[in-house]
Design a protein with these regions (language model features):
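Disulfide-rich extracellular domains of secreted proteins
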Residues: 20-311
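Bacterial Sec-dependent N-terminal signal peptides
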Residues: 1-22
Length: 311
């Protein structure tokens, strides 16, 4: 059975003001192999440097964000971890991509009273090297990654209040040199605004890996890079020029990255066009509701991804 796997990355950006432009999704990689894929990731901002933010009753907007930093390394100002476990050792890595993003209008920001209004006041010039981070593979040491900037709104006329950016690095060769991809991956020095910003702070990373495994079925994998804003208007993404078998059931898996998918905002959804009924069909599972698909969680299928620090 042939299956289709799509990684739509990075990122969907949610805000509820007038429409602004990001960069449209563009095909990045296409593969046809016997194998599978895995995605891991973590946040880089929270209300504590080492402990997870567990209070689901508060809005992201009022959280005074600070860098997560769990690696006990004085040379890093931010770091978080995620792990891969129980994959066979004899896998061949076909493609591995690291993505990171953040809302970064200034180094720090705070909510201040101005007359009868509360306004966000930023301070500290932003570090221009948003594409430069540290990457550590299992049992390895930190090495500098200088990735490609997919999108950065800073200094432009769009997204001026929160200045989102997205970066990407191909790390295929680095993972191919590992004896096993099992273990803990650490990403450090991702940049974002600490404190309170309009809409709330957000930053994080994901690592997407496609691997060959002779025991798996044949699959097509297609990845897309970009950043689009989702507000009151729907954003449509059309998958073109991919192949599938002509008869029988075709199983499809879609992996998505999102910024600003607040748990308390229950208005976002993802739908697939069903040609048989002539309309879009909302997606959902045990951990993602139809009307709150992007709910500030990291999941794999029907389960929360818990192999991370902080979790």
């Amino acid at each position: 059975m042939k299956n289709l796997y799509f990684l739509v990355s990075f990122f969907l950006f949610f805000q509820f003001i007038h429409s602004q432009e990001g960069v449209p999704f563009k095909e990045n990689k296409q593969l046809y192999i016997r194998g599978n894929s895995i995605l891991i990731g973590n946040n880089i901002l929270g209300d504590d440097a080492t402990e997870p933010l567990m209070d689901n009753t508060i809005a992201n907007d009022i959280v005074k964000m600070e860098y997560i930093d769990v690696d006990n390394d004085e040379t890093t100002f931010s770091s978080s971890e995620a792990s891969i476990n129980n994959l066979p050792k004899n896998l061949r890595i076909a493609h591995a991509a690291l993505y990171w993003c953040g809302l970064y209008p200034s180094e720090k920001s705070a909510l201040r009273k101005s007359g009868n209004r509360m306004i966000h006041v930023g301070r500290g010039e932003r570090n221009p090297a948003i594409n430069s981070i540290l990457f550590k593979t299992p049992n390895g040491a930190y090495e500098t990654l200088n990735g490609r900037v997919i999108f950065d709104s800073y200094g432009t006329e769009v997204f001026t209040t929160n200045s989102p950016y997205v970066c990407y690095a191909d790390v295929t060769s680095k993972l191919q040199n590992l004896a096993s991809i099992n273990g803990t991956y650490t990403i450090a020095n991702i940049k974002a605004t600490e404190g309170e910003i309009s809409g709330g702070g957000s930053a994080g990373w994901l690592l997407y890996i496609v691997y060959e495994d002779a025991s798996e079925s044949s699959k097509y994998f297609t990845t897309y890079n970009g950043l689009v804003e989702v507000n009151k208007e729907a954003v449509e993404l059309t998958f073109r020029d991919f192949k599938s078998k002509e008869e029988g059931i075709v199983n499809t898996t879609i992996a998505l990255g999102a910024m600003e998918g607040d748990r308390k905002i229950k208005t976002d959804e993802v739908s697939i066009f069903d040609k048989k009924i002539g309309s879009f069909k909302p997606l959902s599972n045990k951990v993602r509701e139809e009307k709150n698909f992007f709910n500030s969680s990291i999941t794999m299928g029907d389960e929360f991804f818990t192999g991370r620090n902080p979790n």
